[in-house]
Every structure is written in structure tokens, then in C-alpha cells.
Amino acid sequence: MDKLIITGGARLDGEIRISGAKNSALPILAATLLCDGPVTVANLPHLHDITTMIELFGRMGIEPVIDEKLSVEIDPRTIKTLIAPYELVKTMRASILVLGPMVARFGEAEVALPGGCAIGSRPVDLHIRGLEAMGATIDVEGGYIKAKAPEGGLRGANFFFDTVSVTGTENIMMAAALANGRSVLQNAAREPEVVDLANFLIAMGANITGAGTDTITVDGVKRLHPATYKVMPDRIETGTYLVAAAVTGGRVKVKDTDPTILEAVLEKLREAGAEITTGEDWIELNMHGKRPKAVNVRTAPYPAFPTDMQAQFISLNAIAEGTGAVIETIFENRFMHVYELHRMGAKIQVEGNTAIVTGTEKLKGAPVMATDLRASASLVISALIAEGDTLIDRIYHIDRGYECIEEKLQMLGAKIRRVPG
């Protein structure tokens, strides 16, 4: 397994381009299955999960055409099997997203129960209950979800999500696009990635209103037509590089991004002492060499502070002036990175769903291990400011969510290199 070696102490300075959002690209790729012709999706990030999703299509008999800029053309009319096999699905939770489109378009689906990051219990029961409300019959047996649409296809339904679920909202919204009649999704997720998926479906001819609010209305149509669509920028990648610059007292300009989908994070960075300027598709952060001030953070569904930025702000607080509380309300067991940061000298106490972080002027390089995607980003950030070398193991977690992380950090002046395991 590859490792990263980071020598701390370099102040980040420069410009980088932000990649397309993985959490938008994956549902959009799944949604191409709803179309009755070829669809082109552009601005895909070069990430393992994206490759896995494209490989899954290949296993189903679809042959995606990929160009060197990683835009992909998919023609779902060539599909030969409606099974998403375990060996592919086990590595990627987002594979559950093909369930709704396949049942809606082809009348049946068989999808292995998914794998992915080990964060708390992330049940798929909302997906199943939503499809059942639309008339599907579903059995879970042998580790597979087997779903069948009723005679005449899925029916529009009113469905209330007990808990806000991004992938649940996406799956049911996709299925509803081709259902007979109107579906109303209540307590729906409001994330920008849900809006991006809705915009893609609309580009193919779907009739959807309310995306970005907690009530989404979908009037089913008979068919979705070919379209070309560009995936939105990755707001979590954007935020991660801004925090990295803030921690090192540096300056960074991130381009090809969207400041309007990151307001809660930018607000906290300003609170930490960063000077932030924005344009239509760029954000610049400048710390002017100063040490950040500790901030209190509480994660909550969009538009509040995102859970996927929690770990990065623990790293910021770890070297900040003062003490900050980080409260995690979305996932359980999402403080695994704290025990690795302790090895670097961070002063963090975890009490239930709260981490109390007392800033220290210096962290020390140490061998550490990535436990999940965002936790690994926090280790990279802390390593940038630590004295000496930090060796980060199990970085395949990082590669699941960050495109070319070492190249981008090198462009900003970081001393970072990848070594084969």
C-alpha cells in the first residue's frame, strides 16, 4: 500500500484548480441509466470510486467511452445484465445509487449491499422503503437487494424521510423521474449535490421542482432524452485546501469552484482570522503568516457546517490559539482521526459526540494511519504544520476523495511525496 511522507513547516502559497465533485458525479453517473440514448458527463474527478462506477457499467454490458479529460459517454441501451455484483459494490457505498434508476427504467435490479467508509451505521432501509412506497417489491437475501417494479412501472408516491439522507433522496428522486404520476419527497436532503443531480435530470427532460429545499416534487415522464452535463465543483476539496493554507499561515487561490456552496465553512475560516475574497468561480484565502484562532463548530445538514469538513477543522483547532469545541451531529464514530492526531501531540478530548481541542503551537511528525476519507485529510493538514516528517499509511482512503492530492499540495509549496508500500 502506498504511503505519504510529509515534511512539515512549509507555508502554502499559490493557485490550484478544484476537481469535479465526487458526491455529485456518482449519482449523476447512476442517473445516466434512466436515459434512452447516449449521455455525456464532463468534469469527472480522477478518483477510484468514479473508476469503480464506470467499471460497474462495463460489467453490466455498457461500454462507457472516456476521453483524456475524463468526460464520459454512456449509452445505457446496451445494458445486458441488471446485477451490480458484490466484488465491485463492496468497495463503494454509492453503488446503491444504481438501484432506483434500474428499477425505474428496466423494471428490476439486483444490487449487493454496499461497502465503503466505516462511519457508524449507514442503513439502506430508506432507499428500500422509498421504492416500496412506489410499488416495488423488494427482498434482501444473500447480501443482495432484489427489487422488482409492479406491472406498468413504478407509481408516484408521497414519501417522508425519517432522517435526512442524501443518497436516499437521490435514489428516490431518480426513480420518481420515470414513475407514473407525481412523487413528493418530504424532509429531503438540501445538499448542492442533490441540486446538481436534479439539474442533470432536468437537462434530460425530467420534471422536478424544489431541489435545494426539504420538499422535492417530481412529475414522472415517459422517457428521458440524451444530454451533456458538467459536474459541479467539489466543495469539500475546496474547503480542505483552504484549511490547509490557513493552518500553515499561508495564501491560496482555489479556482474552478463556487463560493456560494461553501458559506458555512468560509464563515468559520473568517472567524479563525483568515482574510477571504471571492469571485464567481474562485476563492482566495490569506492568513498573512498569522496563527489561526480556535473556532467552535457544529455539523448539521446543508446549509449548515458540513460533517465532511469536521476533521479538517479539528486539525485547524489543534494548532490554533485558544480552545474550540467540535460537535458531530451527523455520524457516530467520526472521531477516529483524533487518536492519530494524539500521536502528533494534539490536545484533544472526546466526550460523546464532542471533541474539545486545545491549540498547541507545535505538532510533531509521527507515523500515523488513515482510517477514513476525511480523517486522512486531517492527518495531511496536521502533517503540513508538524515539525519533522510524518508518514501516513493506508492512503487509499485519501485517493477515494482527493484527486492528485500530493501534486496539488506540491504546487502550493508543500514538501510531500508518495512512496510505494
Curated annotation (Swiss-Prot):
UniProt lists the family membership as follows:
Belongs to the EPSP synthase family. MurA subfamily.
**Any single GO BP term:** cell wall organization
What stretches pass through the bilayer?
Answer: none
Q: State where UDP-N-acetyl-alpha-D-glucosamine binds.
A: R93, R122, P123, V124, D125, L126, D308, I330
Q: Which residues carry this modification: 2-(S-cysteinyl)pyruvic acid O-phosphothioketal?
A: C117
* Active site positions, chain numbering: C117 (proton donor)
Under PANTHER family, the record lists:
UDP-N-ACETYLGLUCOSAMINE 1-CARBOXYVINYLTRANSFERASE
Query: Which gene is transcribed and translated to give this protein?
Result: murA
Q: Which keywords does the record carry? A: Cell cycle, Cell division, Cell shape, Cell wall biogenesis/degradation, Cytoplasm, Peptidoglycan synthesis, Pyruvate, Transferase
Annotated pathway: Cell wall biogenesis; peptidoglycan biosynthesis
- GO molecular function per UniProt: UDP-N-acetylglucosamine 1-carboxyvinyltransferase activity
Q: From which source organism is this entry?
A: Pseudomonas fluorescens (strain SBW25)
Where does this one sit in the cell? Cytoplasm
Q: Read off the InterPro entries from this record.
A: Enolpyruvate_Tfrase_dom, Enolpyruvate_Tfrase_sf, MurA_subfamily, RNA3'P_cycl/enolpyr_Trfase_a/b, UDP_GlcNAc_COvinyl_MurA
* Listed Pfam families: EPSP_synthase
What name appears for this protein in its UniProt entry? UDP-N-acetylglucosamine 1-carboxyvinyltransferase
Q: Which residues bind phosphoenolpyruvate?
A: K22, N23
Supply the EC number(s). 2.5.1.7
UniProt cross-references to SUPFAM superfamilies, sorted A to Z: EPT/RTPC-like
Describe the task this protein carries out: Cell wall formation. Adds enolpyruvyl to UDP-N-acetylglucosamine.
NCBIfam families given in the database record: murA, PRK09369.1
Q: List the disulfide bonds.
A: none
